[in-house]
Amino acid sequence: MGLPLAHAANLSPEMPHFQFELQAQQYCPTDAVVWVVATRGLYNSSSERWYGRTSNGTYACLGDAEKAGYRASSPVSAGQ
């Protein structure tokens, strides 16, 4: 889905993921966009420091990330 990065193999195959934040926003306009770090099994919300900043992450919809088994990196990001 537009993610030509080596870590893409670590992502859940059923979860749509995106290289660019705008792509994710367009795919899920009514859901929050999160930054998924597949190697850690976590996601960061847009209010967190590492959102979009790690070298091995990708953008995804919150609902899809949670359905695929990823969890919030902190209690604050849960449900945002």
Would you name each region that the model predicts?
Residues 5-80:
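Mature, structured domains enriched in cysteine- and short glycine motifs
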Residues 1-2:
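Bacterial N-terminal signal peptides
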